[in-house]
Amino acid sequence: EIILGREAEKPPVFYRQKERKHTNLLMPELSETTDCVEKYLQGRGIHPVIIRYCLDNKLLFESADYHNAMFVGYDKDGKARYGALRSTVSSYKGELTGSDKHFSFFLEGKPNAEHIHVFESAIDLLSFATLALLAGRDWKSETYLSLAGVFQTKRENVVPVALSRFLDEHPSVCKIHLHLDNDAVGRGAVKGIVGGLQGKYQVYDEPPAHGKDVNDELKIRVGLMRERKERERT
């Protein structure tokens, strides 16, 4: 579904975090292997080729202490500025100390891209890339951005800081594909982004066709998960 703004003359309304002194991202000691992270992500349906790409490009790491998966985002100078943590053995989620959400996890495709695909989490991002790979598309030519989570807010027309920063630094982007969750928070975030951008971009609302999020859709596609209605009938 495409949502076209009507007021292109108005500038986008970006909600920015309060100015704060830049702090360094504190990276923990790394594991000598990435076996736990690779096993965990493959169990979520992520293709090994995409996992290896992220490892080789220092976008994905495994911590030595708890063997958490770490998804790292960089600024335009190549400095690590954000780290999302995901346990490989529990439901724990967190962020590295010193993380700045302006620089959340992303995969950049061809230079001067016109399209960007936007997700709530790094795992949803990698799930979409996997679906593209399985469909025979050139997944590395696309540009993908994780918002590092979306939240309910009392403010209207809020553009997440990760997206506003990315758009500022990539003026070639004119089409935004939102692949946010099929829940109240995800739907509210779509509404806020569309309102906040004020018609400056073509925004496409493209939630997962199956399941709550893009990873659910991937797991259903590859047989790792059944849709809720199918489970209820069994």
Positions of PLM-derived features:
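Accessory, often N-terminal, substrate/partner-engagement and coupling regions
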Residues: 9-10
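Charged interaction scaffolds used for protein-protein
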Residues: 3-4, 185
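TOPRIM fold recognition
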Residues: 130-234
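Acidic, divalent-metal-coordinating active-site segment for phosphoryl/phosphodiester hydrolysis
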Residues: 123-124, 189
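Conserved mixed alpha/beta catalytic, RNA-binding, or beta-rich assembly cores of soluble enzyme
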Residues: 118-123, 149-152
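Short active-site oxyanion
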Residues: 112-117, 175-176
